[in-house]
Amino acid sequence: MFDTVVVGATDSAGARRAFDRALELAAASGATLHVVTSIPRKGEPPPYVPEEFRYTDAGADGPDWLLGQLRARAAKVNVDVAAHPVRAHPAEAIALVAAQEHADIVVVGTGSSRGTRHLSRVPKAVMDRVACAVLVV
């Protein structure tokens, strides 16, 4: 069905739903799951974290820690994961990885407002920028 599934990662409820669905799709089809997290453009990584530890749990900041947690979840169901920390706006980061990895599908979550689900700016921007199918959950 799919060889390459791309999903954005944050600690929001919508992103958690998107990751869960992307993980299900990847597991069912034997796809590689590409997990994208957006690193804000402001500033550089802290100078006190040596480069060899930048993307390990020893030097993990928020996005690094999140990617580690999601990798561990995917490993439990034998899904290959490629982590992509990208210094860009979330929609740009997802679209960039989707293009680079020739994604078959991108999975994004909806935002929520007072219990109702709505399509936020990031899913709309992703839909405008990618050339593959987009699943909004």
Feature roles, as predicted:
Residues 1-53, 129:
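Small/aliphatic-rich secondary-structure junction motif
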Residues 34-36, 82-86, 135:
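General small-molecule cofactor/ligand-binding pocket signal
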Residues 105-129:
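Glycine-rich, Arg-bearing micro-motifs that act as flexible, cationic patches
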Residues 55, 72-106:
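Structural beta-alpha unit
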Residues 42-43, 91-93, 115:
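Generic structural signal for helix capping and beta-alpha/helix-loop junctions
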Residues 129-137:
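Short, acidic/small-residue loops that bind anionic groups at enzyme active sites
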Residues 52-65:
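A short acidic, glycine-rich active-site loop
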Residues 31-32, 79, 103, 132:
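Short glycine/serine/threonine/alanine-rich loop segments
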